[in-house]
Amino acid sequence: MAGRVEVSRKELTKFCREAGFEPSPGMLEAIAGYLELLLHWNRSMNLVGTRTWQDTFHTLVVDSLHLAAFLDTLPLPPEPEVWDLGAGAGLPGIPLRAAWQRGNYTMVEAREKRAMFLRMALARHPLPGTNVFQGRAEAFMPSRPPADLVVSRAFMPWRELLDFVSGHLAPGGQVVFLSLDPVPASLPEGWAVEAESLYGTRCGGRYFWSLRPIIVPN
């Protein structure tokens, strides 16, 4: 492949360890392969704003590794139903699934080219229990079992997302947000904080919040 991006596995291992994670061989290969594919197709599809695999790791992929650790602290079923709404180019989803493979994880993406890229990435490095749905979330949610976990990076403003998914959560279901800010002091009525985590990156501090309905809506 002309102009193929090559990710140094040695350097990637070093970056993972610096962030506090010891990558397994399978996890390392999945993340490296994803970065190579992402940066190659980024030239024509404008998938992400970064231009080198190193910058992409430090600004985007590292969030997925921290997210995997955060999800392990949450009270989830052994095999949760997980929705990644507005999955885009697969961040956080694909690196997350390289590190955290519980349950059934569906990346929902309405844009055809991005959904095509997600399928291409999974065809190159299959990840257990990981799927792509091309279409609008409104069409996806009624067709699935209720979600134990919804993940959102920038699908829609957080208050709107809570309203959007509230009728589709399983008992004990949670919505996890990736944010640059701490969880707001005031939440919509009927919602509570399950957990919050601050973590550091080369780009500064970032947050995860997990919110849950106090009473699951009917």
UniProtKB/Swiss-Prot annotation:
Describe the family membership recorded for this protein in Swiss-Prot or TrEMBL. Answer: Belongs to the methyltransferase superfamily. RNA methyltransferase RsmG family.
Reactions catalysed, semicolon-separated, are: guanosine(527) in 16S rRNA + S-adenosyl-L-methionine = N(7)-methylguanosine(527) in 16S rRNA + S-adenosyl-L-homocysteine
What domain of life does the native source organism fall in? Bacteria
Query: What is the protein name for this chain?
Result: Ribosomal RNA small subunit methyltransferase G
Where does the record place it?
Cytoplasm
Q: In UniProt terms, what function does this protein have?
A: Specifically methylates the N7 position of guanine in position 527 of 16S rRNA.
Which gene is annotated as encoding this protein in its UniProt record?
rsmG
Cleavable signal peptide: none
Which keywords fit this entry according to its UniProt record?
Cytoplasm, Methyltransferase, rRNA processing, S-adenosyl-L-methionine, Transferase
- Xref: Gene3D superfamilies: Vaccinia Virus protein VP39 (3.40.50.150)
Sequence positions that bind S-adenosyl-L-methionine: 86, 91, 137-138, 153
Q: Which SUPFAM superfamilies match?
A: S-adenosyl-L-methionine-dependent methyltransferases
**InterPro entries linked to this entry:** rRNA_ssu_MeTfrase_G, SAM-dependent_MTases_sf
- The species this protein belongs to is Nitratidesulfovibrio vulgaris (strain ATCC 29579 / DSM 644 / CCUG 34227 / NCIMB 8303 / VKM B-1760 / Hildenborough)
GO terms for MF: rRNA (guanine-N7-)-methyltransferase activity
Keyword Transferase appears in the UniProt entry: yes
Q: What is its EC number?
A: 2.1.1.170
- Which enzyme type, at the first EC level? transferase
Q: Name one GO cellular component term.
A: cytosol
CDD domains assigned to the protein according to its UniProt record, in alphabetical order: AdoMet_MTases
Q: Does the keyword Cell division apply?
A: no
